[in-house]
């Protein structure tokens, strides 16, 4: 959530930033809502002061046995109470109106984020390795998996409908191996703390991560009102919800391997074959909670951690800086890592690392105290995929395929596969 005080002081900057995201000016409307709320709050506070004064005068009147004066002040107190009863409800309405308006606005892009309408305006930052080449026509992952008889979309459809996959045998073990390998790298070598989190969360947690109210249609909700997580970012970030941290505790770095659940409401007709875009998939997530001064340094570090996973798997990839038109709602700057898929003949996103500034910290009321200071500051948060396990499985299948349809297992995964070196039918 954006800071209304900052908006009051910098209305032009807000509208300029929103224009980069293709959003109409909002500063005038927000300032008007805030002025109305603050004006009403001032009236409420004035009434409360008058009530307190009148209450004291009741006691003073009774002390000198002036019943008539005491009754007059009692009547004044009752009149003020009636006003406050409705005024408090109106204050709540005005506050909610302002908060709803602020909650609907995305974060402000950093100055060095490239301006653009969509993904076509993203900028390539760097490449790792060159696209894998073959002396045969490479197959896509779904053909490879089905030919191995270890990837079953028909049975998955009977079980759950479209956009689900059943893996079996060595492919199921390979998926598990990838997740364990990624988590081990982040925990034992990159300094993240492993966390096992709930897969069901409350409204407040989804709101704190800035997925509500805007993205409700992209999520699955249970009959009791809880939400299935679309990413472990939601519970990991909310570990500091409503907490006050000491600066000496920061940065906090969390990592988790979880299933993720997405409705893919806006993806009709896209990636309908295979397991590239699923309702349920595994992902390793990284989350950092830090200070304003360290957040951009942490973004570079987090991105390098995600890249390191792909380098160890020897998978060709490129890192992109997302344009203002393609960046996520809560992000101030985002790096996307795209892995090469020979079967498709293109790069596809496998990780996204974002710095959110205090956007989520403000929603969560998560703050920290600098040494020797009484003033509290909202934490800065970052999140990144480290990486999407299913998409990494796709990348391994397509980049390590052989002419006979078998799959060579990357060296770093073989210990997780009990020494298996090749997957065959």
UniProtKB/Swiss-Prot annotation:
Organism: Bartonella henselae (strain ATCC 49882 / DSM 28221 / CCUG 30454 / Houston 1)
Enzyme class name: ligase
Binding-site residues for L-serine, renumbered to this chain: 231-233, 285, 385
Entry EC no(s): 6.1.1.11
Name assigned to this protein: Serine--tRNA ligase
Gene Ontology CC annotations of this record: cytoplasm
Residues engaged in binding ATP: 262-264, 349-352
UniProt-annotated location(s): Cytoplasm
Biological role stated in the UniProt entry: Catalyzes the attachment of serine to tRNA(Ser). Is also able to aminoacylate tRNA(Sec) with serine, to form the misacylated tRNA L-seryl-tRNA(Sec), which will be further converted into selenocysteinyl-tRNA(Sec).
PROSITE patterns on file: AA_TRNA_LIGASE_II (PS50862)
């Amino acid at each position: 959530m954006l800071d209304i005080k900052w908006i009051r002081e910098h209305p032009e900057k807000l509208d300029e930033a929103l224009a980069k995201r293709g959003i109409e000016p909002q500063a005038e409307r927000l300032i008007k809502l805030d002025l109305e709320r603050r004006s009403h709050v001032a009236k409420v506070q004035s009434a409360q002061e008058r009530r307190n004064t009148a209450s004291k005068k009741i006691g003073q009147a009774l002390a000198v046995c002036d019943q008539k004066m005491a009754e007059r002040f009692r009547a004044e107190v009752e009149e003020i109470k009636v006003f406050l009863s409705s005024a408090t409800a109106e204050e709540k309405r005005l506050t909610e109106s302002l908060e709803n308006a602020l909650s609907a606005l995305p974060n402000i892009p950093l100055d060095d984020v490239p301006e653009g309408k969509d993904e076509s305006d993203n900028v390539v930052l760097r490449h790792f390795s060159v696209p894998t080449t073959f002396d045969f026509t490479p197959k896509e992952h779904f053909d490879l998996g089905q030919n191995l008889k270890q990837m079953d979309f028909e049975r998955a459809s009977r079980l759950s409908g479209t956009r689900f996959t059943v893996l079996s045998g060595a492919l199921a073990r390979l998926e598990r191996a990838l997740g364990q390998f990624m988590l081990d790298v982040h925990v034992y070598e990159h300094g993240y703390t492993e966390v096992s989190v709930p897969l069901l969360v409350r409204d407040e947690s989804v709101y704190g991560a800035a997925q509500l109210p805007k993205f409700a249609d992209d999520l699955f909700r249970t009959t009791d009102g809880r939400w299935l997580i679309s990413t472990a970012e939601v519970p990991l970030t909310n570990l500091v919800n409503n907490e006050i941290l000491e600066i000496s505790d920061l940065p906090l770095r969390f990592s988790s391997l979880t299933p993720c659940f997405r409705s893919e409401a806006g993806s009709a007709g896209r990636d309908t074959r295979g397991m590239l875009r699923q309702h349920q998939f595994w992902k390793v997530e990284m989350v950092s909670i830090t200070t304003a001064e360290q957040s951009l340094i942490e973004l570079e570090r987090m991105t390098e951690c995600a890249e390191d996973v792909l380098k160890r798997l020897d998978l060709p990839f490129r890192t992109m800086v997302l344009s203002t038109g393609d960046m996520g709602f809560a992000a101030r700057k985002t790096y996307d890592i795209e892995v090469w898929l020979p079967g498709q003949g293109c790069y596809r996103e496998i990780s996204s690392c974002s710095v959110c500034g205090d956007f989520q910290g403000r929603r969560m009321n998560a703050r920290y105290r600098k040494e020797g200071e009484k003033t509290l500051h909202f934490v800065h948060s970052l999140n990144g995929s480290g990486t999407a396990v299913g998409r990494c499985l796709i990348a391994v299948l397509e980049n390590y395929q052989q002419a006979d349809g078998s799959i060579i297992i990357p060296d770093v995964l073989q210990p997780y596969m009990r020494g298996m070196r090749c997957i065959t039918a």
